[in-house]
């Protein structure tokens, strides 16, 4: 049994945790906000990393001010040793990790490919937290891919890292339901919290020798590539439900957008019409405005209709549908186009 420090901003609380010290040092690799709950969970469980590795500080926001990644900031608040590394493939960096003699590496959304020597440096190997139920949605954007595909259930997986992309043996998994109106950003926060608990359970199981690894079925794997700006383009031939799923998936970035009267337009808020299929939408070409009221109804594939309740022109503030329609004198029969 050991003492562990749980630290919030401005306060420090000491608690006793019912878990023996890990067999050796833990090295934590992580960069974005998604990785912070896991770092906090490790500290709360008496598994504070001996070293936290994160990517270098970079310019962020409109002002392009240089800022340390969320993991680096939180690790500093927790009093942990932090190392910001531009390239983990560097032999000098790997030498420093080997010299530490780690028991295990924990990797959460770090953002770089690990060479085999780094993966194998810890005695117990390298454990990754992935935000999907592997082998589904391997890749850089599993949360967005699950929401965009209309999945009802996703989850988090811990796996032993190998040279293949998210292809290592599965250690533990935890399912999470996706809310009907939940955005990727909202789901990400829930999965991050669940993932922190799963990492702790995984390390406890590895230390106790109670985890049975199982190989992934590669034939069932799907891929979730990194999001790009072009993913925001609306394909009006899709059903309104599919478009709404993409709207939820691409919040806050890259969003959802099309063109109206030749100028780009961002969809700020929308919902599928109920009932899904309507006579006016069935008779109209996808992308055609069929209703203008408190929501702008746009015909979509399969006779469905998307109700847009807020829109935004570039460089202007968002407007509710009625205000926007009045200002642009928008009437039924107008047409949204795809961004070219």
Enumerate the predicted regions with their spans.
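N-terminal Rossmann-like dinucleotide-binding module
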Residues: 17-62
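Internal alpha/beta domain cores that form substrate/cofactor-binding pockets in large enzymes
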Residues: 25, 50-51, 81-100, 105, ...
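N-terminal beta-loop-helix "entrance" segment that forms/cooperates
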Residues: 58-76
């Amino acid at each position: 049994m050991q003492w562990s420090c749980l630290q919030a901003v401005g306060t420090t609380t000491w608690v006793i945790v019912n878990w023996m010290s890990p067999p050796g040092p833990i090295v934590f690799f992580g960069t974005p906000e998604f990785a912070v709950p896991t770092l906090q969970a490790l500290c709360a469980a008496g598994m504070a990393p001996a070293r936290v590795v994160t990517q270098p500080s970079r310019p962020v926001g409109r002002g392009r001010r240089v800022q340390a990644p969320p993991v680096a900031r939180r690790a500093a608040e927790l009093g942990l040793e932090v190392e910001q590394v531009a390239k983990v493939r560097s032999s000098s960096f790997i030498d420093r990790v080997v010299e530490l003699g780690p028991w295990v590496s924990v990797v959460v959304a770090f953002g770089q490919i690990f060479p085999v020597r780094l993966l194998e440096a810890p005695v117990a190997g390298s454990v990754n937290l992935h935000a999907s139920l592997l082998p589904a949605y391997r890749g850089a954007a599993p949360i967005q891919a699950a929401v965009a595909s209309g999945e009802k259930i996703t989850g988090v997986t811990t796996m032993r890292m190998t040279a293949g992309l998210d292809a290592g043996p599965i250690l533990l998994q935890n399912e999470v339901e996706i809310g009907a109106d939940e955005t990727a950003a909202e789901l990400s926060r829930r999965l991050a919290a669940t993932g922190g608990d799963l990492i702790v359970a995984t390390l406890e199981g590895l230390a106790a020798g109670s985890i049975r690894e199982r190989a992934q079925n590669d034939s069932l794997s799907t891929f979730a590539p990194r999001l790009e700006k072009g993913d925001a383009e609306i394909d009006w031939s899709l059903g309104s439900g599919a478009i709404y799923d993409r709207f939820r998936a691409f919040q806050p970035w890259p969003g959802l957008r099309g063109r109206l009267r030749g100028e780009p337009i961002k969809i700020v808020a929308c919902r599928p019409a109920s009932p899904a299929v309507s006579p006016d939408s069935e008779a109209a070409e996808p992308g055609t405005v069929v209703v203008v009221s408190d929501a702008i109804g746009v015909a979509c594939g399969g006779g469905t209709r998307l109700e847009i309740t807020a829109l935004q022109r570039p460089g202007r503030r968002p407007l509710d549908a009625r205000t926007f329609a009045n200002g642009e004198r928008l009437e039924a029969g107008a047409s949204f186009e795809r961004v070219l």
